[in-house]
Amino acid sequence: MFTKQVQESGVYKWFNDRLEIEAISDDISSKYVPPHVNIFYCLGGITLVCFIIQFATGFAMTFYYKPSVTEAFTSVQYLMNEVSFGWLIRSIHRWSASMMVLMMILHVFRVYLTGGFKNPRELTWITGVILAVITVSFGVTGYSLPWDQVGYWAVKIVSGVPEAIPLVGPLMVELIRGSASVGQATLTRFYSLHTFVLPWFIAVFMLMHFLMIRKQGISGPL
């Protein structure tokens, strides 16, 4: 009843004449869903929902977080103890981060076990693997931002891993850290990656991933 009233309204007709909203809606709602699809095919969508929650709560926290080695921890404590519902926003961000990684792993397993990576969906699989790497990168960069003991030593260990690579190892370590040792330059780089670079990358590859799924449809059963 409500839908019919909206479609008969003058505003809806005005937009529909110019943007063909009804045709777009029909195309989305009429997409064929194979009968073998079950709840495990929702894991990718749940991962997307977790990312949206991450984006919203992360954006909210940027109003209070200070990417400084002297103020980062204090700003997080202020958010947790002084800001209204700040503890809830940060907690949701942490919980949904763990859930996003878990759902992503289960989604990868589901696609692999059902053969969703095979011809003609190789590119969809490749973009999915790239999205998985970006998701893990979000976790690595975000873990250090509170700049507490756990975050500091985590980033020191992670950024020191490439040092074992012959020839280019030390150069890569300095590139990641921004200097010879972990400090303000490291925190600034990780903050920039976490809040600007990685969100753009994941948005681009998500769009590519969804467009390919939309074009090729859901893979059939084994």
Swiss-Prot record:
Transmembrane segments: 39-59, 97-117, 123-143, 193-213
Alphabetic keyword roster: Electron transport, Heme, Iron, Membrane, Metal-binding, Photosynthesis, Thylakoid, Transmembrane, Transmembrane helix, Transport
Subcellular compartments: Cellular thylakoid membrane
Free-text remark on how the cofactor is bound: Binds 2 heme b groups non-covalently with two histidine residues as axial ligands.
A GO molecular function held by the record: oxidoreductase activity
Binding site for heme c: C42
Domain of life (superkingdom): Bacteria
InterPro entries: Cyt_b/b6_N, Cyt_B6_PetB, Cytb/b6-like_sf, Cytochrome_b_N_euk/bac, Di-haem_cyt_TM
Keyword Transmembrane applies: yes
Gene Ontology terms: cellular component: plasma membrane-derived thylakoid membrane
Signal sequence annotation: none
List of residues binding heme b 2: H93, H194
GO biological process: photosynthesis; respiratory electron transport chain
Protein's membrane topology: Multi-pass membrane protein
A Pfam family: Cytochrome_B
Role description: Component of the cytochrome b6-f complex, which mediates electron transfer between photosystem II (PSII) and photosystem I (PSI), cyclic electron flow around PSI, and state transitions.
HAMAP family: Cytb6_f_cytb6
Quaternary context: The 4 large subunits of the cytochrome b6-f complex are cytochrome b6, subunit IV (17 kDa polypeptide, PetD), cytochrome f and the Rieske protein, while the 4 small subunits are PetG, PetL, PetM and PetN. The complex functions as a dimer.
Family classification: Belongs to the cytochrome b family. PetB subfamily.
Other remarks on this protein: Heme 1 (or BH or b566) is high-potential and absorbs at about 566 nm, and heme 2 (or BL or b562) is low-potential and absorbs at about 562 nm.
Record's protein name: Cytochrome b6
